[in-house]
Amino acid sequence: MRRIASLLPALCLLSACSSKPVSPPLPPAPQSNASSLPQKTYVPWQGAQASGALTGDFANNPNAQRFIERMANEHGFDRRQLQGLFAQTERLDWVIRLMDQQAATYPGSYGPNGAWLRYRKKFITPDNVQNGVAFWNQYDADLQRASRTYGVPEEIIVGIIGVETRWGRVMGKTRIIDALATLAFDYPRRADYFADELEQFLLLSRKENDNPLALRGSYAGAMGYGQFMPSSFAKYAVDFDGDGHIDLWNPRDAIGSVANYFKQQGWRTGDIVAVPASGQAPSLDVGFETQYSIAALSSAGLRPQGSLGNHANASLLRLDMGRNYQYWYGLPNFYVITRYNHSTHYAMAVWKLGEAVDQARHGYAAKGN
């Protein structure tokens, strides 16, 4: 579920879960030309030849040994097979360095400096918007079906996939098992989290008959068009094309899975995302987790520049426009977008990129918020 706000965009997709919740029944998938989709071969889960001892980069790693015991005792994996698998798994020191860089904190700036404008330019560009139009046109029927099934607008699904992977152009080239094993076994600060993700990764590989040594994604283990972490896969991924397998490198399954994610997070069908405000409120705390009554925001000097519907409360969002700040009323659907990545900039970019692609499809110039 890029992205890294608190850890990494898709990493903020959720905590680990050992079972998938029941999803609503899916309408029949329309017949399509299979040659238009990326091809993937499903093979029996093997991982590696059985081995009597753990060799390779994690040969003397007690965390790896404990993990093997955990998977054998809790999930019935064969110890010798896991030893053979991890003997072929590589420790990636550069992944640890990148994670440390993401965890570093830097002093904040004082006053507006254009932070939102710089962030927006990473995603909302003419070329990127046109690539989004091409993706939407190619998968229009799937996007419409996902919107009908889950109640999530097509532009939100398109915006997520665009921000996460440029509509499949940048899905990551790191072997997922290498990334997750490195962080689970040799990154103490987040070892428990990544051990849970590695557990879910091996479970989904076995369930979907995937070779865990073949799957590639981000340096933190995020997968496919929507950059789901394995725990997100377990909770939200769906077989949207009806072929009997869940494949997040397949854009159709990814579209349905992103839509299901938002539905499960509480997306309100037909509701507003956010509304710009006139005025300034420098004395108020800002962020998607704040909560104010509309009356309190009015008393602080803000006025909505559009309808707030029936909402009596809102978060107060602030975008750095360079010379000043632009304030927004953040509504529940905006908060839902931040569940994918805990960042005001991220959520606004997803929403505005999706809008820009939608407008470009219909021949309108993108709005400049």
Task: Give residue ranges: language-model regions.
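Sec-dependent signal peptide recognition
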Residues: 2-10
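Acidic/His-rich structured neighborhood in mature extracellular/periplasmic domains
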Residues: 111-257
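Sec-exported extracytoplasmic/periplasmic mature domains
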Residues: 68-79, 87-94, 148-151, 162-169, ...
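N-terminal export signals and maturation junctions of secreted/periplasmic proteins
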Residues: 37-65, 69, 79-137
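Flexible, glycine-rich surface segments
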Residues: 208-322
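Bacterial signal peptide processing site
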Residues: 18-21
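C-terminal functional modules
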Residues: 314, 319-369
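C-terminal motif of bacterial Sec signal peptides marking the signal peptidase cleavage site
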Residues: 13-16
